[in-house]
Amino acid sequence: MSIRLLPPTLVNQIAAGEVVERPASAVKELVENAIDAGASRIDVVLAEGGQSLIAVSDDGCGMSPDEMMLAVERHATSKLPDDDLVRIRFLGFRGEALPSIGSVARLTLTSRPRGADSAWSLSVEGGAKGRPVPAAHPQGTRIEVRDLFYATPARLKFLKAARTELTHAADVIERLGMAHPDIAFSLSDGGRKVLDLAAKRGEPGAALLSRIAQVVGREFEPNALALDAERDGVRLTGWAGLPTYNRATSAAQYLFVNGRPVKDRLVIGAVRGAYQDVLARDRHPVVALFLELDPDQVDVNVHPAKAEVRFRDSGLVRGLIVGAIRHALAGAGHRASSTLTGVALGALGGGGGNSPPPSFAHYPPPRPSLPLIRAGIGAQAPLGLAEQGLGLHLPPAAPVAPPEAREGPGEASVDYPLGAAKAQLHDTYIVAETADGLVIVDQHAAHERLVFERLKLGLTEGQVARQGLLLPEVVDLGDAGAARVTERAGDLARLGLVIDSFGPGAVVVREVPALLGDDDVQGLVRDLADELAEWGASTVLEERLLHICATMACHGSVRAGRRLSVPEMNALLRRMEATPLSGQCNHGRPTHVSLSLNDIEKLFGRR
C-alpha cells in the first residue's frame, strides 16, 4: 500500500478527535476565543447539553469577512504575531478550533468588527466552507455549532447523557470565569439559565475572591486562607480552604497558570502533599491557585486541549505550592470551618445547616504489632517517656495532675479564643464558655494534634535518631538514579538516612531513621529515586516519618474516657490556641465545634 496525503476534510476530523472530545471541549475553545477577542460579556446557549446546539455570543473586537474566511482554515491565527511559541499571551494560538469543529458539525459564524456598518455571516458544514453574506448583528461575534459529530456518527456513541454533558460545559465556564472575574458569563440550556456570573469590579483581589465565591459557594470566603508567595520569579496567589472545609472529590480544586485553567497532576500532587497530615485520605481540599511566571518557564503546548502544562523547574513550583499552603494552614492556628456549626445545629435539630455531615476516615485502635510498640513504646505511655523513646530531644510534656488536684474549679477567662473550660462530658468532650457562646472540644483529637506537632518539630530541627545497619544495604538504581540520590545525600542525612555511592549505578545505605524500625530499605530508596527523577525532589522519606509520628501521636495522646481536671482542660485549650493546625487532628477530623449564643438561642426558639 503506497503512502498518500490525506484529504483536508479527513485531516480536520482527525484534529477534531484530539481537540473536540465532547460538547464541553467545543465550548472551551469558543469561549477562549471570545476572551482573547477582548469581550466583556460572553453568553453560551446549549440545547441537549450541547449535542444539538452550542451558541457562543460575545461583544469582542469582531472579524471582517476576510478574517472570517481565514479563521476557518487550519492553523490560521492572529495570536502569534511574532511566530513565537514560547512567550504565548493568549489562551488559543494553534488555529485549530474552528476548522476542527466545522469538520464534524454545522458551523455558522456571524461577526461585526468595531467601527463596521454591518455584520457578515459564514457557514461551514462538514468541512465545506461557504462565502460570507451580509447579516444583522451588533458589534462582536456569535458562533453557532449545530449537530455536533453528525459527520462522525461513531463519536456520538461515546457521549454521555445530556445532563452530564451540561455539567462538563458548566465546569469549563466556571473555571474560565474564575480566571477572568472582569468578564460576565452566562450559560443556558433548553431555555433554563444554568449560570449567571456578573462581572466583578473594584480591587482585583476582592473581585477575584467574590467571583470564586460565586462559583464555589458563599461558604468558601469565610473558610479560605489567602496565599501570596514568590520564589525565583514564580508567584503564587489564591486561596486554600481550611482542612475541615473539604469535599468528597477533587472537583473543587481550581488551578490556573498565567490565567489559563489547567488540570496538572504536578500541581494536584503538590496540593495533596500540603494537606497530607491535616486531611483524611478520602477527603479533598478546596483551593483556587493562581501561578504567574515567565512564559518561557512553562510549556503550554504539550496537550491537545491545552489542559496540562510542563514546567521547566517542576521542583520549584511544587515546593512553592506546598510551602505556601502549609504556611497559611499553620497561621490558621486552631481555626476550624464555619460549616461545622451548621452541621452541629442540624444534628441538634436546630436546622441551622444545609450541608451534609462531613465524612472523616476511620482509623483503627492501636495494634500491638506496630514496630513502635515492639520497640517498647506503649500505646498509653506518658508523653515524656514516649518521646524520649523516639530519640527526639523534646521537652517532656506537663505531668498529669493527681486525682486530688482535680477538685479545684480552676480560673480562666472566657475572653480566650477557646474560652474557659466549664465541664467534661462523658470523660471525652470538653465544654468551654467563650465570650459569645461555647466551644465543644474532642480531647483526644485535640491532644493528638498537639503531640504530633511536637514530634514534627523534632523532625524539622534535624533531631532524628539514627540506627546503624548491621549489614549495610546495597541498592541498585542505575547510573542516573544513583547519581540523583547521592546528590541529595546531605538532605537525606538530616532526616536520618545515610547513603553513600557504591560503585557504578548503586548506593549503599549505612544508617536509617530509628523511627522506621524494620521498614523496607530497598523499597524506600527506590521510591526516593523515582520521585527525584519525576519531580526533581522527593518527600517519600519525610512522608513515612510523618506517618509514623502521626501513629505515635494517636497512641500517646489523652484517650477518650479519661477524666481531666478543670486546670488540665484549660491547659489543653491554651496549648491548642498556640499550636498550628490545631483545628483538626492528624486524620482530618475536627478537634472542636463552636456555637455562638445566637445559635444556641435558635435551638430554643428565642430567635
Swiss-Prot record:
Gene3D superfamilies linked: 3.30.230.10, Histidine kinase-like ATPase, C-terminal domain, MutL, C-terminal domain, dimerisation subdomain, MutL, C-terminal domain, regulatory subdomain
GO biological process: mismatch repair
Keyword rRNA processing in annotation: no
InterPro entries named in the record: DNA_mismatch_repair_CS, DNA_mismatch_repair_MutL, DNA_mismatch_S5_2-like, HATPase_C_sf, MutL/Mlh/PMS, MutL/Mlh/Pms-like, MutL_C, MutL_C_dimsub
Any one cellular-component term (Gene Ontology): mismatch repair complex
DNA damage listed as a keyword: yes
Record-linked Pfam families: DNA_mis_repair, HATPase_c_3, MutL_C
NCBIfam families recorded: mutl, PRK00095.2-4
Annotated function: This protein is involved in the repair of mismatches in DNA. It is required for dam-dependent methyl-directed DNA mismatch repair. May act as a 'molecular matchmaker', a protein that promotes the formation of a stable complex between two or more DNA-binding proteins in an ATP-dependent manner without itself being part of a final effector complex.
Family classification: Belongs to the DNA mismatch repair MutL/HexB family.
The protein's name in its UniProt record: DNA mismatch repair protein MutL
